[in-house]
């Protein structure tokens, strides 16, 4: 079970690496390719509470982008590599990693408050609770209206089908719904950027529709409408604040499911005795199914597909795509959290239980009468609603230098350093692998003696040299072996005889 792992505000001791947020354009990628690099995000939801950190190196061993180092006994998060997947939150035994997001009272700054519940929210409740009750419960928490992200997932499904049906496109297409996966591609697999399906994630589509409809319904300006996402993971919190592929945010904040679940559960219980619902259910069961791994593919149901969940499994699939082994596929649903969004670190329910509930809801939930079909709704909408606004670019993360010549020189030095390291990947140096330590040394962020094995070998060599030096005499005092024996005999002969 993934328990609550949130923080409403950033503690003074919550920090990131010393070079946080500093990147440069036109950098050399980790594989030697020169890319036009995007400036790294200035905001990350995942933070370190330094006072709790024991320097145990669990986080550095599990981070999929090697974005964490342990320096002076404390972890540091490197902004340029962090994808906010939350793996460090999941594995830290000291709860030194946390996620920052908005508190529920943040909605009070707006005249009209709209909630965007993630489909994963429905999986947090037991089987007797229908999504209708959850939507109504949100009104009791201070929201004026609700727009289901699952409804937007129904619309996005239609656009994805259209992309798959196109001819002459690069294959396989990779889902853009998981922001941690999109950032993983930016950071670690820049050659796969063109594989990302050019369709917005459901949460952004939902936000744009919800703001427009609320402004019209309540007669207010769009900027007077506060649109808040109920998020299952820190990656989506970051994506809302620092969206990739867009000119700016479409939402006003994100509230962790773990934070809102308690008051929402009480509101749902209080409403059980009431008949009817105030909020119309507009999503289909297939839209709700996007909350679990395989749900997106079930909804799209077109072409040759695979679904992969768990960030380390995703990395394995992406490596195969780079090698050309999966060119026969049409679509890859890739989710960083095991089990899908129901496995996010900002949820409260066991991911396996929640996944089962979502699967049941996929069959049970239907939109109410009068709701247009997704196909009808999409035909009436501007195509720009579903498109990225700017190209997605690689992030300067594994770059060794700013130009190819210097990068090659540093790569040669890196290989020489790596040859002298033990290759044990023990993490005692504060880097996750020997390769990562060699990269840090080349960048001037570490030294070879940070490796305990290199340090021990040098100490042993120094001790041996000191032993040899201690036996040596200055040249003026030096005598050959024959001369030393002759002097010893003469001393013995000069001794007085014993009487």
At which residue positions do the language-model features occur?
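Generic detector of N-terminal low-structure segments
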Residues: 21, 36-37
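Generic detector of short alpha-helix boundary/capping microenvironments
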Residues: 17, 41, 51, 325, ...
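Compositionally biased, low-complexity flexible segments
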Residues: 1-31
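Iron-sulfur-associated redox domains of electron-transfer enzymes in respiratory
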Residues: 30-36, 95-428, 432-499
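Iron-sulfur cluster-binding cysteine motifs and their immediate structural context
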Residues: 38-50, 54-78, 83, 87-102, ...
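Generic recognition of cysteine residues
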Residues: 2, 56, 85-88, 178, ...
